[in-house]
């Protein structure tokens, strides 16, 4: 019985590989993103059709997929809102990839996850990483460029003063008083 299932899985895998052959280049590009396996890349291509020209921007793709933040505003007050409904297969595959990316070491996506999870919670951080991945996929599919990771220290390099203040604040909460002197 197990041998029959293994044979069926092998036959389906072979058929998927044959059907994905026209999208081999896009599949390889998508797999350069940390956390994305060939299975997730296949789901992304299958659900979007592999043609990103249908979506005018990455934001349109994210909204269609259901990983764009919801909006609930009344009388100038912004309230909590859920994400928009979208493609459940694509959201599921991206969720698995986002969780895998959040556990990778030294990547921008992991830094983004931990930065948002500490403030907003783990589920919102997963959705934010899903959107970042989908934006990267749209950009790679439209330009043909490979994924270039910004690095885990991206936010520190972007705003070094903020990182310095946060480190000082953390030391002060531990009971230390720090006097900064420029290095000579």
Label for each model-derived stretch:
Residues 1-184:
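A detector of single, family-specific signature residues
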């Amino acid at each position: 019985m197990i041998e029959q299932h293994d044979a069926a899985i092998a036959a389906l895998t072979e058929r998927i590989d044959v059907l994905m052959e026209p999208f081999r280049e896009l599949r390889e590009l998508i797999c350069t993103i940390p956390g994305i396996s060939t299975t997730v890349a296949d789901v992304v291509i299958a659900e979007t059709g592999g043609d990103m020209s249908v979506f005018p921007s990455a934001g349109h793709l994210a909204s269609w997929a259901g990983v764009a933040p919801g909006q609930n505003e009344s009388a100038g007050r912004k309230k909590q809102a859920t994400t928009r409904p979208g493609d459940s297969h694509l959201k599921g595959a991206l969720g698995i990839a986002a969780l895998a990316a959040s556990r990778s070491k030294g990547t921008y996506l992991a830094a983004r996850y931990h930065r948002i999870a500490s403030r907003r919670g783990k589920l919102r951080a997963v959705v934010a990483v899903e959107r970042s991945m989908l934006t990267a996929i749209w950009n790679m599919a439209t330009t043909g460029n490979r994924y270039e990771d910004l690095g885990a220290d991206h936010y520190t390099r972007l705003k070094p003063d903020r990182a310095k203040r946060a480190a000082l604040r953390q030391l002060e909460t531990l009971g230390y008083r720090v006097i900064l002197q420029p290095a000579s």
